[in-house]
From Swiss-Prot:
It comes from the Eukaryota. Contains 2 disulfide bonds. Residues 1-19 form the signal peptide. Residues 20-48 form a propeptide. It comes from Californiconus californicus (California cone). One of its GO terms (cellular component) is extracellular region. Keywords: Disulfide bond, Neurotoxin, Secreted, Signal, Toxin. The keyword RNA-binding does not apply. The cysteine framework is I (CC-C-C). Alpha4/2 pattern. It is found in: Secreted. This is Conotoxin Cl1.1. Expressed by the venom duct. Disulfide bonds: none annotated. Belongs to the conotoxin T superfamily.
């Protein structure tokens, strides 16, 4: 029975470590749609506008 508290503590540590690892992954999933302007860059060249991370501007 002495091992039971140790097992409980280990489970808590593992679950908290999983939450720490999972947190940034959730943030990355949420931020992924923001990278769309980079993907649309080729489309924007056709309209005479260049879009980068800093924003869009006229292309010459």
């Amino acid at each position: 029975m002495r091992c039971l508290p140790v097992i409980v503590i280990l489970l808590l540590l593992i679950s908290s470590a999983a939450a720490v690892v999972e947190g940034p992954l959730r943030v990355n999933r949420r931020l992924r749609p923001r990278k769309a302007p980079v993907d649309m860059q080729a489309r924007d060249w056709n309209w005479g506008r260049c879009c980068f991370l800093s924003g869009c501007f006229e292309c010459w």
